[in-house]
Swiss-Prot record:
Its job: Component of the ubiquinol-cytochrome c reductase complex (complex III or cytochrome b-c1 complex) that is part of the mitochondrial respiratory chain. The b-c1 complex mediates electron transfer from ubiquinol to cytochrome c. Contributes to the generation of a proton gradient across the mitochondrial membrane that is then used for ATP synthesis.
Keywords: Electron transport, Heme, Iron, Membrane, Metal-binding, Mitochondrion, Mitochondrion inner membrane, Respiratory chain, Transmembrane, Transmembrane helix, Transport, Ubiquinone
GO biological process, any: mitochondrial electron transport, ubiquinol to cytochrome c
Organism whose genome encodes this protein: Harpiocephalus mordax
Bilayer-crossing regions: 33-53, 77-98, 113-133, 178-198, 226-246, 288-308, 320-340, 347-367
Binding site residues for heme b b566: 97, 196
Cofactor descriptive note: Binds 2 heme b groups non-covalently.
Amino acids binding heme b b562: 83, 182
Lineage: Eukaryota, Metazoa, Chordata, Craniata, Vertebrata
Family per record: Belongs to the cytochrome b family.
Membrane topology of the entry: Multi-pass membrane protein
Gene: MT-CYB
Annotated protein name in UniProt: Cytochrome b
Amino acid sequence: MTNIRKSHPLMKIINNSLIDLPAPSNISSWWNFGSLLGICLMLQILTGLFLAMHYTSDTMTAFNSVTHICRDVNYGWVLRYLHANGASMFFICLYLHIGRGIYYGSYMYKETWNIGIILLFSIMATAFMGYVLPWGQMSFWGATVITNLLSAIPYIGMDLVEWIWGGFSVDKATLTRFFAFHFLLPFIISALVMVHLLFLHETGSNNPTGIPSNTDMIPFHPYYTIKDILGLMVMMMILLALVLFTPDMLGDPDNYMPANPLNTPPHIKPEWYFLFAYAILRSIPNKLGGVLALVISIAILFFIPFLHTSKQRSMTFRPLSQCLFWLLTTDILTLTWIGGQPVEHPYIIIGQAASILYFSIIIILMPLIGLMENRLMKW
C-alpha cells in the first residue's frame, strides 16, 4: 500500500515540497534563509493578528491603543516587540537571501528571481505602512515625507498624493487605509511565496558551485529539515535577545511622542532597513531624480540576470567578482549609515559617492569583470 503522504492529494503537495524534495547534497547554510523567511512571515502574521485585536486605527486613539497593548494586555509588550523586531529579522534574512542569490548566481532562475523581487517590493510596502500605525512623531512625518515623494511625478503627482492621503494631509483617512493594507498585504505575500516556491521547484535549487547537481541529490527530510531547525534556533535566540533585553534598540525614540503636525522632528528618517535607499534618494538634489534613483536602486535587481556576462554561474571560483561583491556589500552598509545621519558636510558628499559607486558596481563593473575573467580563463 502506498504511503498516505504520497497518495493523499494535499499531503502529496507537502511531501513533494518538504519531505521527498530532491535537494543538492552540497548546499551550505546560506540556503537556510528561505525557510527562515517563511517562519518570519508566519510569526509576523500571527503576532500582527493578535495586535490587530487590540489596535484602533483612529488618529485620536491609535497611539494610546499601542500604549494600552504594552501596559494592559497580557503579554501585549511581547507581541508588540516580537512584531517590531520580527520585521527587522525579516529584513536581515531577506537581504542575506538576496545577497546569497547574487553571489551564487541564483538569479539565473529568472522566474523565481523576478517573483522574489516583487516579494521584496511588497514586503517593503507592508513594513512602511506598519511603521505609520503607532502614530508617533516619526510615523506621521515618515508617512508625510515618503508619500509626498509621489508629487514629483509630472502632471498627476499632486492628485495621486491627495488620493493616497484621502484628503489634503496625512490624517485619519490615511491611517485607516494604511491599517487595512497592512493587514491585507501579508496574505498577498503568502500567495506570492507559493508562486516563488512553485517556480523554484520547477528547476530545483542552485548550489555553491553553480554546476547542475542532478547527479547528486538527497531528500530534503531529514538532512535539510535538521539544518533548517538549527538556523531557526539561532534566529530565535537573536530575536528573543533583542525582544527581551533591548527591544527599542532598532526603533526611533521620536516615535514615543504622539504625532504632532505642528512640530517637525529634527531628523526625519525611516526604519534602519530602508536607510540605504533613503540615502540614495537624499544624495540627488532634484526631487524627481531622487525618486527615480530610489525606485531604480531596488528595481535594478530585475536587470541583474541580463548583466551576467561570466561563463561561470557562481562567484565561488571568481576572485575578482568576489572583491566587487564585497565592495558592494560595504557600500550598502555605508549608505545605511549615511541615511541615518543629518544632511550636512561631510555626509552629503559621502552619500553621493556611495550612491554613484552602488550603481557603477552593478551596471558597469560587474559585467566588465565577468568579461575580463572569461578572457583570463581563455574562454
